[in-house]
């Protein structure tokens, strides 16, 4: 009797295993399809080469590439450049009218500024004036006010 009662259990297990195998086969086939689709899109974009960027797309790309440094629309020129030079080309000429790549965009990024120490930043703030200077400044501004009617002669 043990074999008879286990027969339905074995049939259920066998059918369930076959169902899982089919399900796994379908899932793996769909995964393979999506994987092939992704690879195809990557290879076609890799062979497409540089693109043209204009307007807001160009600005967005420059902001992404340069980050906090900022960027120039024209190539920065050195001091003392001659006035008889060729007309200056900018990022629009290079990336909108023609195609450009990432290296070309990076050429228009502003240079990195050296980090300032906490002391030099504090020295530049106008709120850190000595107390005596603040008081003098306040006294001088209140002299000519017409709201104060206590004039001394």
From Swiss-Prot:
GO MF, one example: growth factor activity
Region (A): 90-110
Region (B): 49-77
Major localization class: secreted
Region C, residue ranges: 78-89
Segments of skewed composition (Polar residues): 139-153
One annotated GO biological process: negative regulation of apoptotic process
Pfam families: Insulin (PF00049)
Coiled-coil regions listed: none
Biased segments, Basic and acidic residues type: 125-138
Region entry Disordered, spans: 120-153
Domain of life: Eukaryota
Name of the protein in its database record: Insulin-like growth factor 1
Organism whose genome encodes this protein: Sus scrofa
């Amino acid at each position: 009797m043990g074999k008879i009662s286990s027969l339905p259990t074995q049939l259920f297990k066998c059918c369930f295993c076959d169902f899982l195998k089919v399900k796994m086969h379908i899932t793996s086939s769909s995964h393979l399809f999506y994987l092939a689709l992704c690879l195809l899109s990557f290879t076609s974009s890799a062979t497409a080469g540089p693109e043209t960027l204009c307007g807001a797309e160009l600005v967005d790309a420059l902001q992404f590439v340069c980050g906090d440094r900022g960027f120039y629309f024209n190539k920065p020129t050195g001091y003392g450049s001659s006035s008889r030079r060729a007309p200056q080309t900018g990022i629009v000429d290079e990336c909108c009218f023609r195609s450009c790549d990432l290296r070309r965009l990076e050429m228009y990024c502003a240079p990195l500024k050296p980090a300032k120490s906490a002391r030099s930043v504090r020295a530049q703030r106008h709120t850190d004036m000595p107390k005596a200077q603040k008081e003098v400044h306040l006294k001088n501004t209140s002299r000519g006010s017409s709201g104060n009617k206590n004039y001394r002669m």
